[in-house]
Amino acid sequence: LEYGPEYQDFTKEVQSFCKKYEGLSFTDGSNNPLGSSGGSGGPKMSRSEWQKTLIENGYFARSVPKEYGGYGGEADILKSRIIAAEFSKSNTPGPMGGQGIDMLVPTLLEMGTKEQKEAYIKPTLHGEMIWCQGYSEPNAGSDLASLQTKGELVGDEWVINGQKIWTSTAQYSQMCFCLVRT
């Protein structure tokens, strides 16, 4: 596949960025499964600083509005593929992934209230708030139709009663989004 001039220029831009950060290592440890552990011999920064650097340069959260901590650009699948390809060719870590970024942020952008978007999207994208998902239950597994955990609105707060198991990345998370019966 040969790209047109706009995408050839963009590819060179991404390659230059990757070269600048080649061998990046994280100052906050490498025991987090939500992204690459980084490399060695290159610059050093925290995962949160790296997330912000990627966003500021348009290499992560490209179509998330700036007001919620994203880059604020148009969705462009070809540019996204170029970014993924060039990062995978280099010794430059990509962004953190995880349940919050991959599942919660798109849901909040589509269905969340303004308050929810303001409270959760930016810190999630910036790696300051790590999420796990609470779907599986002891007698239901991941059969969501069989969920037993209940959510009840008491005053202005939701009270959750039930159990969740197999909660991916729970040991790294500050927050959990879960499915409950209401």
Task: Cite the ranges covered by each PLM segment.
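Amphipathic, small/basic residue-rich leader segments at the start of a protein or domain
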Residues: L1-G98, E115-H126, I130
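Short, solvent-exposed loop/turn elements at beta->coil junctions and helix N-caps
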Residues: E67-G69, S136-A140, I165-W166
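Conserved protein kinase catalytic domain
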Residues: A84, V105-L108, I121, F177
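N-terminal glycine-rich flavin-associated loop
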Residues: P95-E115, G141
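Active-site-adjacent elements of ketosynthase-type condensing enzymes
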Residues: N139-L147
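A structural signal for short hydrophobic beta-strand segments in well-ordered beta-sheet cores
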Residues: T149-E152
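A short core secondary-structure module
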Residues: E157, N161-T182
